[in-house]
Amino acid sequence: MLGTRNIPTTSGLPLPPPSSSLSAYIFPTILAIIFAVFALVAIHITTPEPFCTIHIDGASITITNCPDPAAILNKVAIGPWRGLSYHNNLK
């Protein structure tokens, strides 16, 4: 017969046919939801934040994407160089 299972077990009795209960549909759905949440969390964690960039050359200091440029300038020993300018490129 097509669609029946007559697989003998260790006791010699055949296995009953699989039931079409609601749990057969709920379990894969729950697994799919858990997988989707895990994927979204993994994508969110691996998204990099913009870097705080400080570029110092002989003519200027450029600070980009830093939340508190004044604190950075206090920690950097800046001498009174001739022609030095400061640029804050916050985005």
UniProtKB/Swiss-Prot annotation:
This is Movement protein TGBp3. InterPro entries: TGBp3. Its main location: host cell. Plays a role in viral cell-to-cell propagation, by facilitating genome transport to neighboring plant cells through plasmosdesmata. May induce the formation of granular vesicles derived from the Endoplasmic reticulum, which align on actin filaments. Keywords: Host endoplasmic reticulum, Host membrane, Membrane, Transmembrane, Transmembrane helix, Transport, Viral movement protein. GO terms for cellular component: host cell endoplasmic reticulum membrane; membrane. Pfam families: TGBp3 (PF02495). It comes from Cymbidium mosaic virus (strain Singapore). TGBp1, TGBp2 and TGBp3 seem to act together for cell-to-cell propagation. TGBp1 is the main movement protein that physically cross the plasmodesma with the viral genome. TGBp2 and TGBp3 would facilitate TGBp1 function. The keyword Plastid does not apply. Residues 1-23 are lumenal. One of its GO terms (biological process) is transport of virus in host, cell to cell. Belongs to the Tymovirales TGBp3 protein family. Residues 47-91 are cytoplasmic. It is found in: Host endoplasmic reticulum membrane. The chain crosses the membrane at residues 24-46.
